[in-house]
Amino acid sequence: MRKIYNFSAGPAVLPEEVLEQAREEMLDWHGSGMSVMEMSHRGKEFMSIADETESALRELAGIPDHYKVLFLQGGASSQFAMVPMNLLGKKGKADYVNTGQWSAKAISEAKNYGSVQIAASSESDGFNSVPPLAQWHISPDAAYVHYASNETIGGVEFQWTPDLSAVAGDNKNIPLVADMSSNFLSRPFDVSKFGLIYAGAQKNVGPAGLVVVIVREDLLDIPPLAGTPAMFRYKTHADNASMYNTPPTYAIYIMGLVMEWLKKQGGLTAIEQRNIAKAKLIYDLIDVSSFYHCPVNQADRSRMNVPFTLSDPGLDDAFLKQAQAHGLIQLKGHRSVGGMRASIYNAMPLEGVQTLVTFMREFEKNHA
């Protein structure tokens, strides 16, 4: 058993059971005599790994048959460009919801390919909330609406799925696109409500190097923008079962192990309850304390990333140093906001959060 609890925002902690299985299979996967790292991506051994990973994901998330699952490279940041390149089509315009730094990065990239309207924003309150759906303004001619379901830096999370039919007027069938990189598979979600979902793997489902895309098949018929390279066309990868080029094979293998681990935990409903309990422990401590502070609106607080500050920033270094001595690492907040951040993704055990909360109480007692 490892002696530390890793609260990194990503790449993040993986289930210990998964790492142990990967270690056992490192030199010889299922009697093949090969490591997964050495396998041909078109060989029967790896093809079975890829198929089983996709099947497990479809089962866990309830992905309908008319959606394609793509295993791609380039991380979620590549999707900031691929989404507009593939979905803008002749409309040339898209709506984006701005709830923080990752939303802003997606918006900035999309502007290279077409017109972007900000459908809603929480900038006025410092990105400490989620804009209510009633405040969204959907363009009648937008090709899609994009939002980030969880902002890892600001600790803001959508606790609901936007129902665009309620606010889109005549454009009620507009596709909803979601960057789910940091809360993917942390709770049940209805895939049929989305046109496209993308998620970098390195927070909740695997190691860095893999991005998962779930796309409704009809959207693959939209002609990509002129000059879009084959590698940046969703249809290229859908038509070739994510094997157009060599995919990130080992990352897909680890993701498959994580899918099986999630199933053993009871699936997404069970993991959601665990995530709620973990987040509640930290937020409850913060809310009764005058020593710790979280600026995020309570209804919009992230279950995955808990940002907090100390009443005296001069104690930050001492907090981090003493936390590390207690086996609690990677708690430093993002450089753009400072303070602390505890990322408590699916694989973070309840015991890790309990240990953190105990340390926070002790630190407050000694320094308040």
Curated annotation (Swiss-Prot):
E.C. no: 2.6.1.52
Q: Extract one GO molecular function annotation from the record.
A: O-phospho-L-serine:2-oxoglutarate aminotransferase activity
Note the SUPFAM superfamilies from the entry: PLP-dependent transferases
Q: Major location, coarse class?
A: cytoplasm
The keyword Transferase is annotated on this UniProt entry: yes
Q: Extract the CDD domains matched here.
A: PSAT_like
Q: Could you tell me the Gene Ontology terms of the biological process aspect for this record?
A: L-serine biosynthetic process; pyridoxine biosynthetic process
| A Pfam family of this chain | Aminotran_5
Keyword check for Cytoplasm, yes or no.
Answer: yes
Q: Which UniProt keywords apply?
A: Amino-acid biosynthesis, Aminotransferase, Cytoplasm, Pyridoxal phosphate, Pyridoxine biosynthesis, Serine biosynthesis, Transferase
In this UniProt entry, the residues modified to N6-(pyridoxal phosphate)lysine are K203
Q: List locations, semicolon-separated.
A: Cytoplasm
> To which pathway does this protein belong?
Amino-acid biosynthesis; L-serine biosynthesis; L-serine from 3-phospho-D-glycerate: step 2/3; Cofactor biosynthesis; pyridoxine 5'-phosphate biosynthesis; pyridoxine 5'-phosphate from D-erythrose 4-phosphate: step 3/5
Query: In the record, which residues are listed under signal peptide?
Result: none
The protein's required cofactor(s) are namely:
pyridoxal 5'-phosphate
According to its record, what are the GO cellular component terms? cytoplasm
Where L-glutamate binds, per the record, is at R42
Q: Which InterPro entries match?
A: Aminotrans_V_dom, Pser_aminoTfrase, PyrdxlP-dep_Trfase, PyrdxlP-dep_Trfase_major, PyrdxlP-dep_Trfase_small
Q: Which reaction does it catalyse?
A: O-phospho-L-serine + 2-oxoglutarate = 3-phosphooxypyruvate + L-glutamate; 4-(phosphooxy)-L-threonine + 2-oxoglutarate = (R)-3-hydroxy-2-oxo-4-phosphooxybutanoate + L-glutamate
Return the Gene3D superfamilies for the record. Answer: Aspartate Aminotransferase, domain 1, Type I PLP-dependent aspartate aminotransferase-like (Major domain)
HAMAP family associated with the record? SerC_aminotrans_5
For this protein, the record's NCBIfam families field holds: PRK05355.1, serC_1
Its job = Catalyzes the reversible conversion of 3-phosphohydroxypyruvate to phosphoserine and of 3-hydroxy-2-oxo-4-phosphonooxybutanoate to phosphohydroxythreonine.
UniProt lists the family membership as follows:
Belongs to the class-V pyridoxal-phosphate-dependent aminotransferase family. SerC subfamily.
Share what the entry says about its subunit structure, partners included. Answer: Homodimer.
* Name this protein carries in UniProt: Phosphoserine aminotransferase
Organism listed in the record: Nitrosomonas europaea (strain ATCC 19718 / CIP 103999 / KCTC 2705 / NBRC 14298)
What is the taxonomic lineage of the source species?
A: Bacteria, Pseudomonadati, Pseudomonadota, Betaproteobacteria, Nitrosomonadales
The UniProt gene name for this protein comes to: serC
